[in-house]
């Protein structure tokens, strides 16, 4: 479980996060939505340890990370998987080598053990025969699946996904959504997804938090988003074509 309590962050004197408090539960896909500039990417980076908050508290399994030693923080980082917006694969490495990379970096596994684990992860994302290929050989959706395989290689307790459907067609986006959701539930991972995709909200939103101008304005399930009694959320949600079509049939 991850708890953010009154988290604040400023850039050049401008408040980007203004007292955000959210609890993220294991085994759930926790989505952050909001307009550009709402603070959702900054919030995700703070949760993932890529940025430090100016004030507020972050608790991982009840432990305040600001009180942890360097070694204890490294231990949490090793339990964390990150799925970057572009996939961030190493083009000079094969698919297998990409998935093996965090294993060799953090656990110093021998090649045989790392290859076996990489094969398991590629099997889980339905790419069992792609290990010898290079990222340039892959479609956008396949690259995202390889990135997911790499993110789960260390069997993380926490998974942070930044716009995982960016640049994908609707059918591939649905596949990625269901893959993330399935892995989250299967392994009991605390997953946080930053997205603007309403399909994702409705498909996998176990918990959805709506940020507006750096504040957490609303929280509920993906299905509750469409009927929420919140004018700010409503103006954001029903500006999307999908939500407009759904509202027409409600």
Regions found by a protein language model. Name each.
Residues 56-64:
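Conserved ABC transporter NBD signature motif
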Residues 64, 111-129:
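Conserved ABC ATPase "signature" region
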Residues 48:
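Helix-to-loop junction immediately C-terminal to a conserved catalytic motif
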Residues 153-157:
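A short, proline-enriched helix->beta-strand linker immediately N-terminal to the Walker B motif
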Residues 159-162:
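Catalytic Walker B motif of ABC-type/P-loop ATPase nucleotide-binding domains
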Residues 170-172:
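Helix N-cap at the start of a conserved alpha-helix in ABC-type nucleotide-binding domains
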Residues 134-138, 142:
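Conserved ABC ATPase signature
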């Amino acid at each position: 479980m991850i708890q953010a309590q009154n988290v604040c962050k400023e850039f050049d004197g401008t408040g980007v996060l203004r007292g955000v408090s959210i609890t993220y539960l294991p085994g759930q896909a926790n989505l952050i939505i909001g307009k550009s500039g709402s603070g959702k990417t900054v919030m995700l980076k703070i949760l993932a340890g890529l940025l430090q908050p100016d004030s507020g508290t972050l608790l991982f399994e009840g432990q305040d990370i600001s009180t942890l030693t360097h070694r204890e923080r490294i231990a949490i980082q090793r339990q964390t998987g990150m799925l970057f917006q572009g996939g961030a694969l190493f083009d000079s490495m094969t698919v297998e080598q990409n998935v093996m990379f965090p294993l060799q970096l953090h656990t110093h596994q021998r090649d045989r053990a790392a290859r076996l684990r990489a094969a398991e992860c590629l099997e889980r994302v339905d790419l069992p025969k792609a290990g010898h290929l290079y990222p340039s050989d892959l479609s956008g959706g396949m690259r995202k699946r390889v990135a997911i395989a790499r993110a789960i290689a260390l069997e993380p307790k926490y998974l942070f996904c930044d716009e995982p459907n960016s640049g994908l067609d609707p059918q591939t986006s649905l596949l990625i959504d269901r893959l993330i959701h399935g892995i989250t539930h299967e392994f009991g991972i605390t997953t946080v997804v930053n997205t603007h995709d309403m399909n994702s909200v409705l498909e996998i939103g176990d918990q959805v938090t709506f940020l507006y101008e750096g504040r957490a304005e609303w929280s509920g399930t993906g299905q509750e988003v469409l009927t929420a009694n919140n004018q700010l959320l409503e103006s954001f949600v029903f500006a999307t074509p999908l939500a407009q079509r759904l509202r027409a049939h409600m």
